[in-house]
Amino acid sequence: MKKAKKRTRTRKGKARKKFKFASRVIVWRAGYNEGVDKGAWRFARVPEDISAKIKAMQKGRLRRGWGAVYAQAKVGKSEWVTSVFPDRHSATYILPLKKQIRYEENLYDGREFNFAIEIWF
């Protein structure tokens, strides 16, 4: 059985676009009882102007599941490979925040932090 290749830190030969923004950490409580959010997803909302640019760059390209767009994200000293997803409740994309990153960078719910993302096409 062959081992799966690890996704590299950069996607060679792909077009890239970098953005910086400030956003609050939001809790996605869908499917959880009110007041019980242990294990609930946390996201940073990409501002509308940047989301509009990402959407325009995606026009005419094949869509991935849920409309996801490959990205490399950075907050503080931490960087990780992820995807940003369109939020159907607003005209923005959302950036998922891994538990490990939240603990390493002390990202608390409702607080605002500075993020950087590099979108890959």
Predicted feature locations:
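Long, compositionally biased stretches
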Residues: K2-A91, A116
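Short, compact, well-ordered microdomains
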Residues: V81-W120
